[in-house]
Structures are given as C-alpha cells and as structure tokens.
Amino acid sequence: MHERDVELFNDSIERCSCRSDFLNRFYTLFLASSDTVAKKFEHTDLRKQARMLKTSLYIMMSASGESERIVHLERLAKLHSRTELDIKPELYDLWLDRLVQAVKEFDPMFDAETDAAWRRVLQPGIEFMKSKY
C-alpha cells in the first residue's frame, strides 16, 4: 500500500461520510447482492453495524503495523471465522465490490484511481480476514 493510496482513501471516505446515508446505502447494496448475505444479517442492528464498519475501515487502512490495530483485526477475524459467524472467504470480495459501488455513488470525485486506492488499502485486511477463516 502506498502513501498516495492511503491519502486517496482517506479523502474519499471523508467525502462519503459527509452524507449520513452512505453506510446505509452500502448495506442496502450488500444485502441485496446475495441471499447468503441477507440471511447473515437477518437479526442485525444495521445502525450499530454501520458504526462498527466505519471504525473497522479505518483500522483496516492502518493495520500494517500498530499492535492495538492488529489486535482489533485479530478479534474481528476470529468473530467472522467458521467457528463463530461463519463468514465464508468469498463474501469478502462481494463486500468490497459493494462498498466500492457505494463509494462511487457518494464520492463526487470518484475515479479509477480512487477505486484502485480503496481496493489496495482494504485488500491486506481482507486477505487477513480470509486467512483466519
């Protein structure tokens, strides 16, 4: 991950977060993308989930070092593993695609470089989550 990617990601998430319905839109897209996903979220408080997601996005962005962030990712990965929530690895790719789709809708400066930055910034965290399944 390059410094420029982190900068683009950070600026983009700030633009998206200016609108309170950004993460709601993401969850609408994500839940509609798969029956499996919809079932996983059947009894979930989506407002609480959206707050946790925003925190997790920043943690994933900066998970390349600081031990407390890595500890958070470890906890998150354990929770999502086959022994707890059983989030299958292929669902993370769908998650990222729907997240970037929501970003495209909400970030007025979205372009191919922004798309690539979101993917490069989040990919290490996603790969970590998949590896702990």
Predicted regions and their residues:
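Globin-like tetrapyrrole-binding proteins
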Residues: 1-133
